[in-house]
Swiss-Prot record:
Domain of life: Eukaryota
Protein name: 5'-3' exoribonuclease 2
Organism of derivation: Homo sapiens
Residue positions, PTM Phosphothreonine: T439
Subcellular location: Nucleus, Nucleolus
Tissue expr: Expressed in the spleen, thymus, prostate, testis, ovary, small intestine, colon, peripheral blood leukocytes, heart, brain, placenta, lung, liver, skeletal muscle, kidney, and pancreas. Isoform 2 is expressed predominantly in peripheral blood leukocytes.
Omega-N-methylarginine sites (modified residues): R824, R847, R851, R883, R895, R946
């Protein structure tokens, strides 16, 4: 989803939705790796039924990772993908279904975003290669050290698009992987696996949602199925809420900013290519055996609990005294719809609504304020009530001017703070900073850019003396740098990037000044704001987009041909008269074919993935569609600071012209290219232990050519139709490995078959409601009336999936072990450094502690085992105090008491002294009530009621 900061905003506003995954790691014994047994209970105290993998979120980080060296070839990429899936599977451990969905041909509305992203990737890749070569030449010219440049072909991530050879090979590798795991992994024993590869049209996450919607509409569906969806896109959260399933969880890799990345030139960490100085790499390990080790740890996974998010939203959206019945499911649908205004993959966000400015909170407040005017909800099962939406947008339009002014004030304030911070840091810098080879360096800073550490100080000093002796005479007026070398009299010209103030991008619109609407339409659309007809056309297209996106989320693709034909969005104040705008879409549209989509989204630099005659249309000056593939294009920052936040001003592809040009080159396709250009479907896999195994085998034995209904009683209520697969995996047939480093499967028992979801009429409406029989999970958030209804009980927060999860507990043997290995003096409690009491209780009187008596009192019989290794409590907490008995005068033996305390002090310090021989800080709370102090002339007071040891 086109909201990069959405997940960060969501996790900060609703923190309890996040749960850290408990992951069991594989073990290694005698050099043999022992995988995790996924058939055992889930260590996260929850059992998932279905696991859905949005595979593109796995393919990209495995093929071109940012925080580690990339795989050397395609085979290593496939193995990395297999290992990533294994890791996810061992965390989630699904019991019924594993659904793998790879992005297929996308709707036309998404192709514009894909086109922009791929053109940007190609442009940035070429610019990075040019910059890398320039820095390399500069470093080598200065005598720097760089490893020899590897002659290898740069991996073009644009090949991760339907129709390429890479995606076709990936589908074959995943078929082999599924067969291998179903044959050999006990955790996959009774699992149903569905693979929807790139030949099946649709985005991966929407293919998953379409499967869930169609299964929910079946009478045999279990309404309490626990779903787990893997993916990092923000729209997965919206899609999960749109299912109205009570048990829906998202697993994603935890994002950790500022991860170390290796330099593209020297492969060292700590600097980028532009800062590389060509310094030799420091040896890691005695024999450089740790050269390939990475400083970054393996990424961790987190769970996002949508049932907890539903609790948050129910509290936030609940309204009293409504003119209609409150329905939390409908209000959540409205919340999902309002999130579309701050951005998505199909529409640009409104200029006045930024996620970083709490735009969603603003929309929710307006939504609750005008609900009495609207008289109902904004949406119903994916269909929009435009009359009510108009009231919301006009209310936003009334505050647009103040939003723009506040945004400008906040930006100016931020720049002032940054400028003052730079001045303060510059002022606090020391006047002289030592540098050079002999300068002391902090531990661990040898890998920092620019650091030079002398391995032989004596030799380095000798070389410096010889260099000074051989240098020409220097005038007295010559200035020196910190390392002793003369600096030019004229000084060094300061670089542009060293300036105190960074140049701000030119903004011709100036939304914070009067006349902002006229300037916006003139600069962005090249029309006058007074052109009411054009403005209404832009608004109508945007309203159509809102209806299309909501229908896409709740009902499926309404039209494969529709798209938003502008680069920018209108203002909220322009949403007048939208209630009468049509929101119907052309029916019966078909998706592009894979190679046709490649022609629509690829730049000319990625034409090597296309057939030669098709590729020529991208680069031939005489091509009828050459204008679709500009070599360079402008990026409008649109008020932003960084290029990646800007808008790529690419021409839109005319579908009619594209198809007309491709008709001439279609005959040039080979049979293999024709196969890759065809649309496919899903494939279902089961092992020999699955109840469906024998049923599918019988279909192959009978050779049935007609689709057959899936028996739901054999596969947990899954319904659809089976048809025979021409490339099926069958028992007793060898499954050849497409990856040379992996072995063939000679004893296969897995069977595969084509699978098709249940089909419905084109005008069928999937109801956005919670199904009958669905049980909501137990509430996780603290009840708002807990203080009134708890009768003084303390609230116990739920940290994981199970509220009754047993806490970690050690038995008495473990406490004895801890008490044995931990010295008494190393305790950290308030009594750890306290001296023994000066008196001990004998009979009913306090007596002096004689030298021959034991220094440690006897432990109480009812002491908890976990307290035994912490040392005994003070004596006055152990003994019963009798108020009716007097105390002996302490004066006769006060001298003995002082002598005894004086004798104890050296022993205590000798026992607790640190490495330097100095005693630690005493923390015996001397002088407070209940704690002894030297020279006290009265008996200790009775114990207070705050201590209870029973």
């Amino acid at each position: 989803m086109g909201v990069p900061a959405f997940f960060r905003w969501l996790s900060r506003k609703y923190p309890s939705i996040i749960v850290n995954c408990v992951e069991e790691k594989p073990k290694e014994c005698n050099g043999v790796k022992i995988p995790v047994d996924a058939s055992k209970p889930n260590p996260n105290d929850v059992e998932f039924d279905n696991l859905y993998l949005d595979m593109n979120g796995i393919i990209h980080p495995c093929t071109h990772p940012e925080d580690k060296p990339a795989p050397k070839n395609e085979d290593e990429m496939m193995v990395a993908i297999f290992e990533y899936i294994d890791r996810l599977f061992s965390i989630v451990r699904p019991r019924r279904l594993l659904y793998m969905a790879i992005d297929g041909v996308a709707p036309r509305a998404k192709m514009n975003q894909q086109r922009s992203r791929r053109f940007r990737a190609s442009k940035e890749g070429m610019e990075a290669a040019v910059e890398k070569q320039r820095v390399r030449e500069e470093i080598l010219a200065k005598g720097g050290f760089l490893p020899p440049e590897e002659i290898k072909e740069r991996f073009d991530s644009n090949c991760i698009t339907p129709g390429t050879e890479f995606m076709d090979n990936l589908a074959k590798c995943l078929r082999y992987y599924i067969a291998d795991r179903l044959n050999n992994d006990p955790g996959w024993k009774n699992l149903t696996v569905i693979l929807s590869d790139a030949s099946a049209p649709g985005e991966g996450e929407h293919k998953i949602m379409d499967y869930i919607r169609r299964q929910r509409a079946q009478p045999n569906h279990d309404p309490n199925t626990h779903h787990c969806l893997c993916g990092a896109d923000a729209d997965l959260i919206m899609l999960g809420l749109a299912t109205h399933e009570p048990n829906f969880t998202i697993i994603r890799e935890e994002f950790k900013p500022n991860k170390p990345k290796p330099c593209g030139l020297c492969n060292q960490f700590g600097h980028e290519v532009k800062d590389c100085e060509g310094l030799p790499r420091e040896k890691k390990g005695k024999h450089d055996e740790l050269a390939d080790s990475l400083p970054c740890a393996e990424g961790e996974f987190i769970f996002l609990r949508l049932n907890v998010l539903r609790e948050y939203l129910e509290r936030e959206l609940t309204m009293a005294s409504l003119p209609f019945t409150f329905d939390v499911e409908r209000s959540i649908d409205d919340w999902v719809f309002m999130c579309f205004f701050v951005g998505n993959d199909f529409l640009p966000h409104l200029p006045s609504l930024e996620i970083r400015e709490n735009a969603i909170d603003r929309l929710v407040n307006i939504y609750k304020n005008v609900v009495h005017k609207t008289g109902g909800y904004l949406t119903e099962s994916g269909y929009v009530n435009l009359q009510r939406v108009q009231m919301i947008m006009l209310a936003v339009g009334e505050v647009e001017d103040s939003i723009f002014k506040k945004r400008k004030d906040d930006e100016d304030s931020f720049r002032r703070r940054q400028k003052e911070k730079r001045k303060r840091m510059k002022r606090d810098q020391p006047a002289f900073t030592p540098s050079g080879i002999l300068t002391p360096h902090a531990l661990g800073s040898r890998n920092s850019p620019g650091s030079q550490v002398a391995s032989n100080p004596r030799q380095a000093a000798y070389e410096m003396r010889m260099q000074n002796n051989s240098s020409p005479s220097i005038s007295p007026n010559t200035s020196f740098t910190s390392d002793g070398s003369p600096s030019p009299l004229g000084g060094i010209k300061r670089k542009a990037e060293d300036s105190d103030s960074e140049p701000e991008p030119e903004d011709n619109v100036r939304l914070w000044e009067a006349g902002w609407k006229q300037r916006y339409y003139k600069n962005k659309f090249d029309v006058d704001a007074a052109d009411e007809k054009f403005r209404r056309k832009v608004v109508q297209s945007y309203v159509e987009g809102l209806c299309w996106v909501l229908r896409y989320y709740y009902q499926g693709c309404a039209s494969w041909k529709w798209y938003y034909p502008f680069h920018y969005a209108p203002f909220a104040s322009d949403f007048e008269g939208i209630a009468d705008m049509p929101s119907d879409f052309e029916k019966g549209t078909k998706p592009f074919k894979p190679l046709e989509q490649l022609m629509g989204v690829f730049p000319a630099a990625s034409g090597n993935f296309l057939p030669p005659s098709w590729r020529k249309l991208m680069s031939d000056p005489d091509s009828s569609i050459i204008d679709f593939y500009p070599e360079d294009f402008a990026i409008d920052l649109n008020g932003k600071k960084y290029a990646w936040q800007g808008v790529a001003l690419l021409p839109f592809v005319d579908e009619r012209r594209l198809r007309a040009a491709l008709e001439e080159v279609y005959p040039d396709l080979t049979p293999e290219e024709t196969r890759r250009n065809s649309l496919g479907g899903d494939v279902l896999f089961v092992g020999k232990h699955h109840p469906l195994h024998d049923f599918i085998l019988e279909l192959y034995q009978t050779g049935s050519t007609e689709p057959v209904e899936v028996p739901p009683e054999l596969c947990h209520g899954i319904q659809g139709k089976f048809s025979l697969d021409e490339e099926a995996i069958l028992p007793d047939q060898i499954v050849c490995s497409p990856v040379p480093m992996l072995r063939d499967l000679t004893q296969n028992t897995v069977v595969s078959i084509n699978f098709k979801d249940p089909q419905f009429a084109e005008d069928y409406i999937f109801k956005a409601v919670m199904l009958p029989g669905a049980r909501k999970p137990a509430a996780v958030l603290k009840p708002s009336d807990w203080e009134k209804s708890s009768n003084g009980r303390q609230w116990k927060p739920q940290l994981g999936f199970n509220r009754d999860r047993r806490p970690v507990h050690l038995d008495q043997a473990a406490f004895r072990t801890l008490g044995h290995v931990m010295p008494r003096g190393s305790g950290t409690g308030i009594y750890s450094n306290a001296a023994p009491p000066p008196v001990t209780y004998q009979g009913n009187l306090y007596r002096p502690l004689l030298r021959g008596q034991a220094q440690i009192p006897k432990l109480m019989s009812n002491m908890r085992p976990q307290d035994s290794w912490r040392g005994p409590p003070p004596l006055f907490q152990q003994q019963r105090f009798d108020r009716g008995v007097g105390a002996e005068p302490l004066l006769p033996w006060n001298r003995m008491l002082q002598t005894q305390n004086a004798a104890f002090q050296p022993n205590q310090y000798q026992m607790l002294a640190g490495p330097g021989g100095y005693p630690p800080r005493r923390d015996d709370r001397g002088g407070r009530q209940g704690y002894p102090r030297e020279g006290r002339k009265y008996p200790l007071p009775p114990p207070s009621g705050r201590y209870n040891w029973n």
